[in-house]
Amino acid sequence: MQTLGKTLNMPLYRGLSNGRPESNRSDAKATLGPCGLFQCFLRPFRVAGSARLSRQMLALLVVAVALPAQAGLAIQSWTAKSGTRVLFVESRSISMLDVAVDFDAGGRRAPAGKAGLAGLTNGMLALGSTGLTESQIADQFADTGAQRGARADQDRSAITLRTLSSSAEREAALALLATLLQNPSFPEEALNREKARAIAGLKEAETRPAAIADRAFSRAMYRSHPYGASASAESVASISRADIVAFYQANFSARSAVVSMIGDISRSQAEAIAEQLTAGLPAGVAPAVLPPVGVPDPSPIRIAHPATQSHILLGMPAMARGDADFFALTVGNYILGGGGFVSRLMNEVREKRGLAYSVYSYFAPLKEAGPFQIGLQTRKEQANEALKLVQGVVADYVAKGPTAAELKAAKDNLAGGFALRIDNSRKILDNLAVIGFYGLPLDYLDQWVANVERVSLADVKSALARRVKPAEFAVVVVGAPE
């Protein structure tokens, strides 16, 4: 189960969105804090009494693997009367409906000193509404057999819903979701409980080298930019109910929202659902223009820790969502450190020298320049050697680019595995949300393989030269050799 991510505002969205292979995500930074409000994945079912509802819940559980891989997705898009952008895929293969409502209400929108506010606000939406207690909300979702989820990253906050598409269950689940989105009560008692839970998790995380490294790396990479802010026990403790109400009123508006849907409904039904979910949202305010992402602090950060291994992170802000270099960098990263055992870093660091069990690299594009990150763990006495080796491998790769054989293997693997990235409704929903929120072309998924196959050696080399500058890398070593 996904835990409290990068201290309430880590990137929790998955799928093909960042060009990083699903099979190489052992480094996912889901390490800080207890399970609870801020988990990416949907809450488990509460047990319902009737055999009919039990069968409905079984259908919900199997739907994630029952949808065949699809080619040529017919994505429909329009703007609702409320001003919300809507993306919809009609899918009649299973009697289900998946919905996501994404808001421009990620961690970057939190005021200075209030890191964690975005995730806390998002999670609190389901803990009380006008005329409904937390327990009543949970019971009503259980009665319909629906699943509700919450997720957040630096850019977005979202609520998700999975329900049967039959009229009674669908209408009840959507009515409840609309109530949560439009009339949250943010009860003080629930807020205090969730703050205490989060603070306990954050304090525990402060003892773990992976969490310490992640926080220090974000700060070194983004300095004072909002992307570099990580929640702390102090920042969460400072969040009041008034802060949450103000953040909700300012950022959870129809004009900042994107509604994504896939399922067994018609276009006209989808239009009505989008209006139902967004018509009563706050008016919101025009989002503040964020400062540009600057150059990282290149001074290596070495933090003592009693752990037997050193945790090493290095990288820099590199690429925004929709960047023209995305596909060249996706292919290039697969060769460098995204391809598991066939990557250069794995070959040099693990296979040839045995300095680490695993080493990875990835790009995570955001609204502004998202991180390019390399990570590994190694024994303390080997940390300096491993870091120097990684820096050398990256510098050589950026200078010379890949070989023709590496390029072909990477493109074949990425193109051949693409179908697995959209083989169920949940994955498709995640990608619809990415397309809608970041304004990507509607044929983005249809053209993904062709765009990968179009990448040349020159494309990779020139993109790396523009986006990956080893001399500017932020470097963090936790558990540094003494």
Feature annotation, model-predicted:
Residues 8, 17-22, 26-46, 51-54:
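Short, low-complexity, charge-dense intrinsically disordered segments
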Residues 57-59, 69:
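Cleavable N-terminal signal peptides
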Residues 64-68:
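N-terminal signal peptide c-region/cleavage motif recognized by signal peptidases
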Residues 71-95:
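N- or domain-start disorder-to-order transition segments that initiate the globular core
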Residues 89, 94-122, 134-179, 195, ...:
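M16 family metallopeptidases and their MPP-like homologs
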Residues 227-228, 254, 258-322, 477-482:
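An aromatic/glycine/proline-enriched structural segment found at the starts
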